[in-house]
């Protein structure tokens, strides 16, 4: 199954924020979108779309201004990988054929359910915790 590039961007953004939130010591420390763009190798234009989708889904909050940026909301620590994939891939549909093959439709539906059940065994925070400390560390 091939996922959209936007899905990868959404997952990387959440992983980066979850990974870096451990090192943030003060409330009000926000991650700049330009930093996310650089460290995750996502174009700034694509990242702004990704951040907008994640904000509307209630997973992160944005703060405008010179000292602004992005922060994870507490709910994000428990969000499952499959939920993020579904957010960006919705609606997932199985391939259609020229023939009405009910058995094939059922098989594809079962495969999608299995796919999401597997992804939903892991949270974004669990993935972030398993990353090496300098996973997102890029220098110009």
Segments predicted by a language model, with ranges:
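Key DNA-contact positions within bacterial/archaeal DNA-binding proteins
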Residues: 45
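Short, hydrophobic-biased segments on the C-terminal half of alpha helices
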Residues: 51-52
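Conserved segment of winged-helix/HTH DNA-binding domains
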Residues: 75-101
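C-terminal regulatory/oligomerization modules of transcriptional regulators
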Residues: 97-140
């Amino acid at each position: 199954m091939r996922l959209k590039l936007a899905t990868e961007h959404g997952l990387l953004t959440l992983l980066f924020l979850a990974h870096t939130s451990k090192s943030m010591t003060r409330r009000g420390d926000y991650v700049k979108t330009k930093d996310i763009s650089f460290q995750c190798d996502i174009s700034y234009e694509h990242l702004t779309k990704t951040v907008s989708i994640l904000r509307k889904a209630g997973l992160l909050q944005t703060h405008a201004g010179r000292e602004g940026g992005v922060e994870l909301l507490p709910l994000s620590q428990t969000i499952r990988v499959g939920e993020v994939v579904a957010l960006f891939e919705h609606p997932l549909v199985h391939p259609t054929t020229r023939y009405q093959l009910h058995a094939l439709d059922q098989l594809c539906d079962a495969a999608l359910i299995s796919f999401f059940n597997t992804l939903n065994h892991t949270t974004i925070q669990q993935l972030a915790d398993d990353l090496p400390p300098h996973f997102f560390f890029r220098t110009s």
